[in-house]
């Protein structure tokens, strides 16, 4: 039985890709059709590849491997933090700082500084500082928490990178590839499947799609660490031909409402003042 059902994926809008003019031809084999100028992802393949990713992460977690969740876009950020925490892993959900992997020793120094400042805040040491110095120090603590809070307990480079929006997180992807760190990634229709080791064709823009897929991957990690979960779909297995028919029905209606976030606008975080 698949870890996610066809109705669940349809309801979450997992099948909606990008505008046809914004596709990557390498994703052709994962595309079912197009409607109203939007590519429609083949959910039969999504279900199969999600099962493979689930097994891969469950086994990796069972072996004690550490996974870093990466997703900094507005739609992904809260899901990334929530699901990484739930399964006891690490996350980056604000800005990917250059060298987070390739210059890990320097990043770890900043993480240690964050933990030191947290201790000072907890034991009241910051309250003993001059007012201006305390204010500057607290601002530094806030900034370090924002960008490095998800790495506090990560003492070494991760064994696997889990990415939402391969294109947006290209710096993280390139660093991982340089260090031969395996990548698990959602693959929207504008992505390059050659840049990931374990890919899952899916809408990486809609919040519900991100929550569904990342949630299932977090389930796999949790299961590997703690044992069997009981939250698989209880529906009967869907015959192989059914997904095609169901998707055809689902995309018969206009797709704009489900794919309004598939345009050119990208969310970015502005540099903060020191």
UniProtKB/Swiss-Prot annotation:
Question: Domain of life here?
Answer: Bacteria
Q: Which stretches does the entry tag as region Disordered?
A: 255-274
Instruction: Name the keywords, alphabetized.
Output: Ribonucleoprotein, Ribosomal protein
Q: Which CDD domains match?
A: RPS2
- What is one GO biological process annotated to this record? translation
GO cellular component terms, A-Z: cytosolic small ribosomal subunit
Determine if Lipoprotein is one of this entry's keywords. Answer: no
Provide any one GO MF term from the record.
Answer: structural constituent of ribosome
User: Matching HAMAP family, A to Z?
Assistant: Ribosomal_uS2_B
Q: Which family does it belong to?
A: Belongs to the universal ribosomal protein uS2 family.
Entry protein name: Small ribosomal subunit protein uS2
- This protein's species is Gloeobacter violaceus (strain ATCC 29082 / PCC 7421)
